Regions:
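Exposed, low-structure sequence patches enriched in small/polar residues
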Residues: 152, 249-251, 293, 298, ...
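Outer membrane beta-barrel
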Residues: 183-239, 243-272, 369-370, 374-377, ...
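Bacterial Sec-dependent N-terminal signal peptides
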Residues: 1-23
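Surface-exposed loop/turn segments flanking beta-strands in extracellular/periplasmic regions
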Residues: 224-234, 277-288, 517-520
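Compositionally biased linear targeting/interaction segments
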Residues: 20-193, 197, 201, 206-210, ...
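Aromatic- and glycine-enriched pocket-lining scaffold segments that form the walls
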Residues: 250-301
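Outer-membrane beta-barrel proteins
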Residues: 174-188, 242-245, 346-348, 473-476
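Extracellular/periplasm-exposed beta-strand and loop segments of Gram-negative cell-envelope proteins
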Residues: 239-245, 286-290, 523-527
Length: 580
């Protein structure tokens, strides 16, 4: 036994020395979204924010529309920054940015990876930035083998052309695992024109539409995890261009907005089914086969120095209207206290939804937030959260209680649920961090309790880093997921290796694990069964304009009972990215 312990200690030491510096991209995305775990992020939102990391927003040159559509700032912060820029000129340091009303040092540290202080007034920066041309091209492919004799593959390609801040055009095609033939099964594309003189934009193709707090319209998935104060208030981006491989979460059609004094008018027409049009032969005629719908809508916003009021309306134009919603929202910042709310009404279902919340700084190192929700026959809820930062310790705590008017099960008369979570991060020394997350879910139906405990030990120094995760979950049964990860990153090359095992006997006990992948590919598998998995990820910048990303993984199930044995599965991914 002593020899085994010695071997384990030696292997762990060697593993530490061969580890790589942990990438900060996912940490930056987690921070700006206000979530604590990457497993809570939507893949579409990850892809959007990762693109901002690759191409930070040049806030000194950005228009009001660009600042708002980034989704990084509240309306108060946008107005405050534009007012500061008009009075004092361009912001030349992050310390100066933190001094702008609504921008604290804490907030600036969160958004710093996503913004740039590029200035045409500085030496070496061209004055004709508004006419500069940028090209982005990404090509990816993957091969997967599972059941003997069964092999699957996929691919994707996307391209974007951007001319200053006047024109942006993007297109993408992709084929998913399981799709028949070699032809792409998903298409996406869009063109955006901006006229800064008239404070107007036109978008054709795939676009995003996000207004208020999302009760009437917010395409894509919203972060519903209320585990930190930053996640409570949604920062509506209005209309913005979509650039993803599939465009499955985007709206498709025509949209535009224009600024008139303190008002911003946005109008759009979404056409679900437009991408599904097929050409078929009927007798001797060749006719299109489609099931196309038309969903027009608009948003009218009145904006002031400290916030905004807006009204959103959307409906589906058919003989029998299947959808029609109207909402009114407000968001204001009064002496550092954010107050916001939205009320919407579904004219078809005759249901209302109301939410109201606030977040504020209690004292140095402590911020609190609360949110009330009344969703007609769906749920009534109240949530409270706090974030603390004291010396070497920081974290969050939250409680979210919900009551469901319609019972979730015929076996109970009262449906109540309460979720609590506590996160603690301790910076032991400069290169060693300990993280712990404890969450509990109590409900009156189904499995009454769900307890999740996770700890992470993170080591990072120079070009070396390592992470050890230990996760145990108790619901119907008890499940475990553990892994060790390390790699190397220096100059133009980075390599990450991970080895883990899992024991999950019930689907209700599944544990999601974030896996490193290439840009635009968000990988969060649900661990289920009894097995081992190994992954290796590499990123290589082979030229000033080109990068190669590679990922290989293998999952086996050697610990499964004989009657449930299943074969392992292997996957290989390659992706080239060119920027010129």
């Amino acid at each position: 036994m002593r020899r085994v312990k010695m071997i384990v200690a030696i292997l762990f030491s060697v593993w530490i020395e061969c580890a790589a510096q942990q990438s900060l991209e996912i940490e930056s995305i987690l921070s700006v979204l206000g979530v604590t775990d990457p497993e809570e992020i939507d893949s579409y939102e990850y892809e959007r924010l990762y693109d901002l990391l690759e191409h930070p927003l040049k806030i000194n040159l950005a228009s009001q529309s660009e600042l708002s559509s980034s989704g990084l700032f509240s309306r108060y912060q946008v107005a405050s920054f534009l007012d500061y820029r008009s009075r004092n000129g361009e912001v030349l340091s992050y310390m100066e940015l933190a001094a702008v009303d609504g921008f604290t040092e804490e907030f600036v540290s969160l958004v710093r990876p996503f913004v740039s202080l590029y200035s045409i007034g500085l030496p070496g920066h061209p004055e004709k930035y508004h006419r500069s041309v940028r090209n982005d091209l990404a090509v990816k492919g993957a091969f997967k083998s599972g059941i003997p004799g069964e092999k699957e593959w996929n691919y994707g390609l996307k391209y974007r052309l951007k001319v200053g801040n006047m024109l942006s055009a993007a297109a993408a095609v992709s084929k998913a695992y399981g799709a028949e033939g070699a032809s792409p099964d998903a298409f996406a594309g869009s063109v955006m024109l901006e006229a800064r003189k008239f404070r107007g934009r036109i978008l054709v193709g795939d676009y995003n539409a996000r207004f208020g707090q999302g009760l009437a319209l917010w395409n894509g998935s919203m972060i519903n995890s209320l585990t930190s104060p930053s996640a409570f208030m949604k920062k509506a981006s209005g209309l913005s261009q979509s650039w993803s491989y599939t465009g499955s979460s985007a709206l498709t059609g025509v949209a535009g907005d224009i600024g008139l004094g303190q008002f911003v008018l946005s109008a759009f027409v979404d056409m679900p089914g437009l991408k599904d049009i097929k050409i078929k032969q009927y007798g001797g005629d060749i006719l299109p086969d489609f099931n196309l719908a038309v969903r027009p809508g608009f948003n009218v916003a009145w904006q002031s120095r400290f916030g905004q009021l807006s009204v959103t309306h959307i409906m589906q134009a058919e003989r029998v209207v299947p959808e029609m919603k109207t909402s009114a929202d407000v968001a204001y910042c009064i002496r550092g206290v954010n107050i916001y709310g939205e009320a919407s009404y579904d004219w078809v279902g005759r249901q209302y939804q109301i939410l109201s919340g606030t977040d504020f700084r209690v004292c140095e190192g402590l911020r609190m937030a609360s949110l009330l929700r009344f969703y007609s026959d769906d749920l009534y809820g109240i949530a409270v959260s706090g974030a603390y930062d004291v010396k070497a310790h920081k974290g969050t705590f939250s409680v979210d209680t919900e009551y469901y008017p319609v019972p979730k099960s015929k076996d109970v008369d009262l449906s109540l649920q309460c979720k609590g979570q506590f996160n603690w991060e301790w910076q032991i020394i400069d290169c060693l961090t300990f993280k712990m997350r404890v969450s509990e879910r109590l409900r009156t139906w189904g499995v009454n309790t769900r307890t999740d405990i996770r700890t992470d030990f993170c080591y990072a120094k120079d070009c070396i880093s390592a992470t050890a995760r230990f996760n145990v979950l108790r619901c119907r049964g008890t499940s475990f997921v553990n892994y060790l990860e390390g790699g190397y990153k220096r100059n133009n090359l980075s390599v990450y290796a991970r080895q883990g095992f899992f024991i999950v006997d019930n689907w209700d006990d599944r544990i999601y694990v974030y896996e490193r992948d290439a840009p635009g590919s968000f990988n969060v598998p649900a661990m289920y069964g009894r097995g081992l998995w190994t992954s290796l990820v590499m990123a290589w910048r082979f030229a000033s304009v080109g990068r190669l990303y590679a990922r290989t993984s293998y999952t086996s199930y050697p610990f499964m009972p004989e009657e449930k044995k299943k074969p392992g599965k292997a996957e290989l991914k390659l992706q080239f990215v060119f920027r010129f």
